[in-house]
Amino acid sequence: MEKSVRGWESVDFFEVDNVERPDEPIAPGAHCLVYGPKESGKTTLLFQHALSVANRDPSARVMFVCKRDAIEARPPLLQRASTLGDGAGRIQMKYLNNDAELRRLGSVIHLLPPETLPTLIVIDGMTSFFAPAQGGDNREREMRLARTLASLHECADSCGRMRSEHVVEGEQCLLLASCPA
């Protein structure tokens, strides 16, 4: 098996000439949260990264998790379909509605055959899956969010271990989530 350690490449996020690239890449194996104002381009950034990863590595499998109504109302800004590359076919869209479905996905994803496990899990609009707390007390909602993030972190690590054992030695699965400010 060929050793492959996939990390975050600045080129994945910054393919525009007038955007300054960071000096240091994000450490391999590190998971990442993209945080910013509502409608600031987080979905476009996430999808561009997913596409870049899938185009760069033919063995990459990307799972892009989002709410269908949100992605249809404000789709990511993309290049023309003819220039998306072969990687677009390796991005699996998964539409979920709430935090229970998100936790369920994280608890069963390891049942997939190792070669179909994702190498990148993208969660667009993480907090949108969690209903607002009734009565104004958000502690319970925040605890569910924290537990779900921890579960998804473990899910990504497990997918990476399984792919490393059965597909490509040293391969990882990274978790990338967005959250509006």
Where are these regions (language model features)?
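Substrate-engagement module of ASCE P-loop NTPases
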Residues: 140-180
